[in-house]
């Protein structure tokens, strides 16, 4: 997605510890037109798989996931990082390691909104080591829903998260791929990668 690639080159910053700062695009400030285009790209890729639900994690995944759900005209469910007292039992729970939070994060989804019969696409902001996506995949498996594919706005290709998630057996679509980032070269980014099937599932 060329508009996203250019925005990362213009606005992205490398922080200590190998962190990529793009909070002017997706994590703090949102650019509506860019976000809408993200959703349209994800929807175009995953529509042939006939999803009936989009799943993400709060907070940064919500904007691109909502844009995708709007384009697909399906509900969006986002995993909560704290279990509210209003969440009905049973709940599906998994744990993820958050680099930005500096530790483990528990994720919760109510069985009221995810279950057997749901055909799910997961949308998130980053694909790095793949831990968060694997946690969401675990929640989907616990619910009895079917995971159709994974979509991420930005992939850190050098962290090899895509390969680590290969055992899930689902297609992965990303919109921008960070090849490397360092003080000498800055952020080296290209259009994202996809391994979507050419024909609808089944």
Swiss-Prot record:
GO terms for cellular component: cytoplasm. GO terms for molecular function: xanthine phosphoribosyltransferase activity. Keywords: Cytoplasm, Glycosyltransferase, Purine salvage, Transferase. Its main location: cytoplasm. It catalyses: XMP + diphosphate = xanthine + 5-phospho-alpha-D-ribose 1-diphosphate. It is found in: Cytoplasm. Coiled coil: none annotated. SUPFAM superfamilies: PRTase-like (SSF53271). 5-phospho-alpha-D-ribose 1-diphosphate binds at residues 128-132. InterPro entries: PRibTrfase_dom, PRTase-like, Pur/Pyrimidine_PRTase, Xanthine_PRibTrfase. Pathway: Purine metabolism; XMP biosynthesis via salvage pathway; XMP from xanthine: step 1/1. Pfam families: Pribosyltran (PF00156). It comes from the Bacteria. GO terms for biological process: purine ribonucleoside salvage; xanthine metabolic process; XMP salvage. Its EC number is 2.4.2.22. Xanthine binds at residues 20, 27, 156. Belongs to the purine/pyrimidine phosphoribosyltransferase family. Xpt subfamily. Homodimer. Converts the preformed base xanthine, a product of nucleic acid breakdown, to xanthosine 5'-monophosphate (XMP), so it can be reused for RNA or DNA synthesis. This is Xanthine phosphoribosyltransferase.
